[in-house]
Amino acid sequence: YNQPPVIADEIIDEFSAYKDIVTNHVADTSLLIANAIKNKKTILFEGAQGTLLDIDHGTYPFVTSSNTSSGNAAIGSGIGPKNLDKIVGVTKAYISRVGSGPFITEQKNEIGDYLIEKGAEFGVVTGRRRRCGWLDLISLKYSVRVNSLTELFITKLDVLSGLEELKLCVGYKDNGVTITAVSYTHLRAHETLSH
């Protein structure tokens, strides 16, 4: 690689100095959380990315490399799922997606442009425009089920305030048949469906 060789002793010496700094901050997190729960403390877990990006429950292969659904809070923290007594989902009043993948309600028109501009739908790092479209209640219903949501917060309602007409997807059409629930294990369906 045209780089000088790594000298193990130098690396060990450098990182050994960090041991004393880090040691006091290392603990069995699952035990700390379990004790906090036992002592009636409020514990908040925060997830990132949407359900449809979940490696197991998303629109594979257009997913991330991890679990984004609420069950991962229990898995990642080492507490049992029965300790998750409130699961709050958050969605926008419209849908956005980064990159490729199925997007049945995508608006590749002036509506999409409006949502992108008014909703500031640009990637934080890249500045790339996100794809935007109408709220898809079929996907939302799936997300509610997969995550066992107890509450749902809807954000960015103000973005829709300048539109004369609002649309919601309440079903998919597949060869003239209306579908109101979809299993995301069948990606082929997303490629042929319309709203």
Task: Label every model-predicted segment.
Residues 29-53, 112-126:
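Short, hydrophobic/aliphatic alpha-helical segments
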Residues 14, 75-77, 176:
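Long, low-complexity N-terminal extensions
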Residues 1-32, 43:
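Internal alpha/beta core interface subdomains
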Residues 5-9, 48, 88, 100-107, ...:
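Short coil/turn segments at secondary-structure boundaries
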Residues 80-131, 162-184:
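A structural-propensity feature for long, helix-poor, extended segments
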Residues 185-192:
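Conserved small/polar residues in nucleotide/adenosyl-binding loops
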Residues 42-77, 95-98, 124-148, 154, ...:
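Conserved phosphate/anionic-ligand binding catalytic regions in large, soluble enzymes, centered on
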